[in-house]
C-alpha cells in the first residue's frame, strides 16, 4: 500500500468522490484527507469515516483571519492541520494573525501535526522551537539548508509535484535522507507539469488537468530516479516512514483496504 499524505478531497474539482476512491483502491493508494478550516475538516471527517481512511483537522494560514479552530472529535483524525505560516499570500491573512492562529493550534499539544510553510521559514522554525511533536512539513518548496533545519527538528518532509518545480527542488530531494521523506499529491493541485524540472524524471507520465491521489506514483518514480535508487527500496522506506509517523491507525486502514 502507498499513502498519499495530502488529498484535498473537499475541493470542488473532485466531481465524483466515489470514483476517486475506486481509482485509489485499484492503484493500492490510501489517501489522507486535508481540512483547511472547520467546514472542510468536518467534511473530511465524514469522508474518512465513510471510506475507512484518515484525515487532518485544522486551520490553514490563509483562513486565519476569519476562523476559529474547533477540534473534530473522531478517531479518524490523525493530526492537527493543515496549519502553519504562508507569507506568499498575505492579502488573505496578516503575519500576526497567522502566527497567533498557528500557536493556538500548537498549544493543543497534539501528537502529530500536518504543517504548511511558505516563504516563512525563519518565523516558522522560531515558533516550532517552543514545541516538540511528530510532524510533516508538507508540499516542501524551500532550500537544501531549510530542509536540513527541518530534519534536525525531527520532522518529515512532504514531497509533491510543486516540490519538483525547479532545480533547487531537485537538489533538495537529492540531499534528503530516505527516512525523512513522505509523499503526497496535494490533489487536485500540485501535479508535475511538463515545464517542471522534475518532469524529466518521470517515466510514466499521465496527462491530466487536475491531480488525483492515484497519480502519486509519478512522485515516487521521480524521487527514485533523482536519487538513483531502485523503486522497491524507496517503496519499502516510504512504508516504514508512514508507519513510523502515523502508527497503528494507519496499519488498521491497510487491513481494511486490503479486504
Curated annotation (Swiss-Prot):
Main location: nucleus
Pfam families: TatD_DNase (PF01026)
GO annotations of cellular component type: cytosol; nucleus
Cofactor note: Binds 2 divalent metal cations per subunit.
Alphabetically ordered keywords of this record: Hydrolase, Metal-binding, Nuclease, Nucleus
Positions bound to a divalent metal cation 2: 82, 116, 138
UniProt-annotated binding residues for a divalent metal cation 1: 82, 186
Gene Ontology MF term list: 3'-5'-DNA exonuclease activity; metal ion binding
SUPFAM superfamilies assigned: Metallo-dependent hydrolases
Enzyme superclass (EC): hydrolase
Family recorded in the similarity comment: Belongs to the metallo-dependent hydrolases superfamily. TatD-type hydrolase family.
Name the record gives this protein: Putative deoxyribonuclease TATDN1 homolog
The species this protein was found in: Vairimorpha ceranae (strain BRL01) (Microsporidian parasite)
Amino acid at each position: 500500500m502507498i499513502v498519499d499524505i495530502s488529498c484535498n478531497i473537499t475541493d470542488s474539482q473532485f466531481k465524483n468522490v466515489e470514483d476517486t476512491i475506486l481509482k485509489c483502491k485499484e492503484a493500492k493508494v490510501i489517501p489522507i484527507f486535508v481540512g483547511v478550516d472547520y467546514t472542510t475538516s468536518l467534511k473530511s471527517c465524514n469522508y474518512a469515516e465513510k471510506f475507512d481512511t484518515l484525515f487532518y483537522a485544522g486551520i490553514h494560514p490563509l483562513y486565519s483571519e476569519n476562523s476559529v479552530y474547533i477540534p473534530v472529535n473522531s478517531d479518524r483524525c490523525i493530526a492537527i492541520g493543515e496549519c502553519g505560516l504562508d507569507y506568499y499570500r498575505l492579502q488573505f491573512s496578516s503575519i500576526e494573525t497567522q502566527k497567533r492562529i498557528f500557536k493556538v493550534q500548537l498549544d493543543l499539544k497534539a501528537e502529530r501535526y500536518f504543517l504548511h510553510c511558505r516563504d516563512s521559514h525563519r518565523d516558522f522554525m522560531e515558533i516550532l522551537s517552543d514545541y516538540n511533536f511528530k510532524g510533516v512539513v508538507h508540499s516542501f518548496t524551500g532550500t537544501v539548508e531549510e530542509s536540513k533545519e527541518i530534519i534536525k527538528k525531527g520532522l518529515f518532509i512532504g514531497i509533491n509535484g510543486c516540490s519538483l518545480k525547479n532545480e533547487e527542488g531537485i537538489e533538495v530531494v537529492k540531499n534528503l535522507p530516505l527516512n525523512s521523506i513522505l509523499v503526497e499529491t496535494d490533489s487536485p493541485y500540485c501535479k508535475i507539469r511538463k515545464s517542471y524540472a522534475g518532469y524529466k524524471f518521470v517515466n510514466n507520465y499521465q496527462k491530466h488537468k487536475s491531480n488525483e491521489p492515484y497519480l502519486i506514483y509519478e512522485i515516487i518514480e521521480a524521487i527514485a530516479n533523482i536519487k538513483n535508487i531502485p523503486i522497491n527500496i524507496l517503496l519499502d522506506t516510504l512504508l516504514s516512514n508512514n508507519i513510523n509517523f502515523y502508527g497503528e491507525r494507519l496499519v488498521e486502514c491497510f487491513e481494511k483496504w486490503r479486504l
